[in-house]
Amino acid sequence: RTGWLGLCALGPIMIVYPEGSFYIMVKPEDIPEIVTEHLLKGRVVTRLLYQETVTPDGIKSLNETDFYKKQHRSALRNCGVIDPENINEYIARDGYQALAKCLAEYTPEQVIQIVKDSGLRGRGGAGFPTGVKWSFAAANQADQKYVCCNADEGDPGAFMDRSILEGDPNVVIEAMAIAGYAIGATQG
């Protein structure tokens, strides 16, 4: 189980650690060879390697490839790195620390201001400022407020929401909890 790493055109993909061998276009019939040769005998199956990761000195990190080296993964930083179904792996990578900090150190109004000042925008095409949206919700007088996760892709073939929900669902839950605290939600 793992989340989305990008490079969808090369999938299915598999990374074997600790050296980070990046196998591409893996088929079910390739698995016995990977297990026997790589996992049991310690020999990389070179025919399945993403060639850009192969150097005369060995295998370079996927993060050093042309596709990744200029990227800074923020929202997707854990995708493909942690088991998305294991909360302990999320916590081990500082998961839920932002929520703990918000609850312990900031008022809801301060959280909204921090989000406004950050320039954070929604992942949809409109790019609406998140802090502004939260301030509208916080100002709304209601007996009950909700935080909802709209993860319905509007563009056919787009996997922005799917990738984060499948690869790092706890980051979404943590963000929803922070939003709930900031706007005064009672349900989510």
What are these regions (language model features)?
Residues 1-188:
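Feature of Fe-S/electron-transfer and energy-metabolism proteins
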